A protein has these predicted regions:
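Conserved SAM-binding loop of SAM-dependent methyltransferases across substrates and taxa
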Residues: 119-131
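S-adenosylmethionine
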Residues: 166-169, 173-240
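Conserved SAM-binding motif I beta-strand of class I
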Residues: 133-138
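S-adenosyl-L-methionine
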Residues: 139-183
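Class I S-adenosyl-L-methionine
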Residues: 228-271
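Conserved class I S-adenosyl-L-methionine
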Residues: 109-118
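Non-catalytic substrate-recognition/targeting regions of SAM-dependent transferases
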Residues: 4, 9-11, 27-93, 101
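Conserved alpha-helix/loop element of class I SAM-dependent methyltransferases that forms part
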Residues: 94-110
Length: 271
């Protein structure tokens, strides 16, 4: 009756539903989607936003209601700013929920380095979990500005926000250490500045000099084409004193046909 919606990502941020598609869908499918979501008992929403990620411009379409403003994601005791009408990432990744939960439970007493921090939700979670300090590094000033707001509205202190091109700033980053916990959560492809297959190992090989004994690395990988073995092999080759300990998948891995094609979060400890 409803058709196949496996090519869509549907996220619910009450009172808004955000639908993301990477290929064009016809009007009939859009109408069917609205009907389907409207038929679900107890699913209350005022706005339905379609984000067309296959387009670079003019890629937001409002299927129901109006464009949302002042939107937030709520997780645990935290609140994060969202921009649900943006043509790019909305400012928060639901699939990283288990990673934030791990930080709340394990970051106490640690000095944290958060590389590719984006809007800094991992820093907020770490500080909520008792981290002593969290240094957030990203090359996007607007993302860091949102990160600062996320910290203020969650009443956490101890964060620093540094606007660096990470691949060109290892010396300065290392000087601010040493660190007890390093988070690496890069985009798969950030144009000329970072590509996972080309550049991830360059960060890994710098870890020994910037970390304390017993330090933990939270290494994230979100490429559908690269599995956990990519990171495990890279650590063995470029930072063999870091031993693999555990792995988490996306918060929605039980819905995925192959969790290895989604978010992978691997933890390594320095011997």
């Amino acid at each position: 009756k409803w058709g196949d919606f496996s090519h869509l990502s549907i996220d619910y941020y009450p009172p808004t539903i955000l639908v993301t598609t990477y290929k064009e869908i016809e009007k009939e499918e859009k109408d069917s989607l609205v009907d389907l979501l409207s038929s679900i008992p107890n699913l209350q929403f005022d706005s339905l936003v379609l984000q067309k990620r296959y387009l670079k411009t003019d890629n937001i379409e409002i299927l129901k209601g109006e464009a949302p403003s002042n939107s937030y994601a709520f997780e645990a005791v935290e609140r994060y700013i969202l921009n649900l009408a943006t043509p790019q990432n909305i400012g928060f990744f639901l699939d990283m929920g288990l990673g934030r939960e791990w930080l709340r439970k394990n970051a106490a007493g640690k000095k944290v380095l958060n590389l590719f921090s984006y809007t800094c939700s991992l820093s907020v979670a770490a500080l909520k979990g008792g981290a002593l300090e969290a240094i957030n590094v990203d090359m996007s000033r607007p993302a860091l500005n949102v990160g600062e707001k996320n910290h203020r509205q969650n009443n956490v202190v101890g964060a620093k926000f540094i606007h660096y091109d990470i691949m060109k700033s290892f010396g300065n980053i290392t000087k601010k250490g040493p660190y007890d916990l390093v988070i690496i959560d890069p985009p798969t492809n950030q144009g000329a500045s970072f590509k996972v297959e080309r550049d991830y190992h360059k960060i890994i090989r710098r870890l020994p000099e910037m970390t304390n004994e017993g330090a933990i690395v939270m290494a994230c990988l979100n490429s559908p084409y690269l599995g956990s073995d990519f990171l495990i092999s890279a650590f063995k080759e470029f930072a063999p004193m870091f031993h693999f300990e555990e792995k988490l998948y996306s918060s929605f891995s039980d819905m995925e046909a192959n969790p290895e094609e989604g978010l992978k979060i691997l933890f390594f400890r320095k011997a």
